[in-house]
Curated annotation (Swiss-Prot):
Compartment list: Membrane
The keyword Lipid biosynthesis appears for this protein: no
Protein name: Siderophore transporter fer7
Species of provenance: Mycosarcoma maydis (Corn smut fungus)
Spans annotated as Disordered: 1-62
Top-rank taxon, per record: Eukaryota
Basic and acidic residues composition-biased segments: 42-54
Amino acid sequence: MSNQAQDQPERRDSSSENSSPFKDDEVAADQSVSAHGNTSLNKKDRVSAVRDADASSAREGQQPGVTRIEALYRIFPRNSPIVYTVYASLAAVTICFALDQSTTAAYQLYATRTLGSHAKLFGVIATVEAILNAVSKPFIAKICDIFSRQTAYFLVAVFYTIGFVVVASAQTPAAFAVGRIITEVGQAGFDLVTDIVVADLSPLEWRGVVTALTSSPFIVLPWVGNLIQARLNTGRPEGWRWGYGMFAIMAPVCVAPIILVLMYVDRKAQKAGELSFASSRLETRRAQEQGTVKVQRDSLRDRFANLVQLCKEMDLVGLFLLALSFSLLLVPFSIYKDADKQWRNPSIIAMFVCGGVILGMFLAWEILLASHPVMNKRVWYNRTFLLAVTIDIFYFMGGNARSTYYGSFVLVGTNLSTANWGYVVNALATCALSVFGLAAGFYLRIFHRYKFLQIGGLVIRIVAMGLYLYGRNGNLTTMVVAWSQILNSLGGACSVVGTRVASQASVPHQDLASIISQLALWTRLGGAIGSAIAAGIWTGTLPDYLAATNLTPAQQSRAYNSPTTIKTSYPWNTPLRNQINQAFSKTMKPIFIVALVLAFIPLFAGLLMPNYYLGKTQNAVDGTDNSGRVIESAEDNPNAEINRKNVKYAKGTRLSWLW
């Protein structure tokens, strides 16, 4: 933070902000201008400067995790070896994560062949993973803010390692599913915490480039990973176990450096007086003024009270209700086919009813009772964030609907070898996404704007979805598959980088982890809906289409549960193989249509997205750099007009929502 911000009168406790969402904008503007050390603005200018009021209120309650990461640039210059060590440590984490993402999807196909229940297990795992990926991120983000980034890294590494141990040793489909679900928490955490730290350390003008660099290992590793998975899957009966198990060893080794170096930064910052008891600088000054620097051991009652307060700040009740409601609403799409009377089964109906009721309980809790809600009010008044959610929720919904069974469809519908199938389906898509993401990042660095690029990407993605739909009924050539993947990656890279940078630019540093996690929460839940839609269509139609072929019931069951056996059991271009291909093609048609229709909604939202100028600040709101120091005054902010519109929208939203 700046020296001016430190010298201002004692700030209010952050809880008062949460209890007063209707605070007068002019008063907020006065406080914000004072915080910036500038009182020369007239009344009109101060009202327009209310953008800083939200930022100021966020800094008032700035949590220890944010202050800790800001201390890096306050203690060490940007060219310091410690800073470069942080970058190198982040690279180790991203390489491990990229290799995981480049291989484990292929292992799952062969694991379910060994354990059975391919179609049902695939759909349930995809749905539950998407739900857990979403609801775990706000929890992990709160760990980042309340404690520290390194604490969050340690926690997710534990989940990641334990999950892969369970998966590698699984002897039943249930054990495999449990392991994958535990692993998903770790994977979601690595992705989230890395995104948060990258945004912590990079100015807006470089945010797109640095974010893309975390995905740069995907340029190389998918090709290497495909060789690894092909060798393991074809070289030994249960090679997939080795594929999963190696990450239980790699993860602790790769994540340890970033944890240790951030702990070292903490220690240096405390010695320099930037931190005290892992608290914010404001808390340190108050402790010195009040003479309470001496540490005293808490009583058992105090410890219990601290635990209760921690649970409130985590909003564990809200996260539990959210996870339970969406699980009950989405899982039936994957299991209804095996239920007696299917949709009319009392258990299926009860799941939908209970899911809807619990979702209502979640909303009531968040609006009326939660002291630290998952849906932070300051974030949800943010027009940029709401548009970003709209774009990404339908982006992931259509994308997951298309991708959940696309690998199985291409495996059966083409004559590609296992290695070439992996190259086209997995390696090409992820490599292209990384390359185009890096190019999009440099576009943002050069032009300092993102909206034109984002809209172009959304249009390209619509074309890609149309090409996926075209690739059926004999049109599924290698060229069609490749170009579908390339165009989808190009459009996705341009869209995602715009959404991420815009949403992060629209909030002060204190809200950074919250907005990243909340964007991930709702977009991943959109992905869960997409996976559930695909699972419902797949499990509801493929068995019927296979029954219309000349396969015996036993052959139908084997083809449905383990598509990998089709390549070896039914030679290419034989009558039975052609019938099977046709059954898979008919099943995918409605899935592709859903994905194509959903691709238009993000385009409409993208047209309404503001176009922030990306400069040297950490965000476009409060004029601070990555160390928390104010480097840009309110009147010099090139995004002042956008911020004024956001304030006007937020004020109207507060009145309309009655929060």
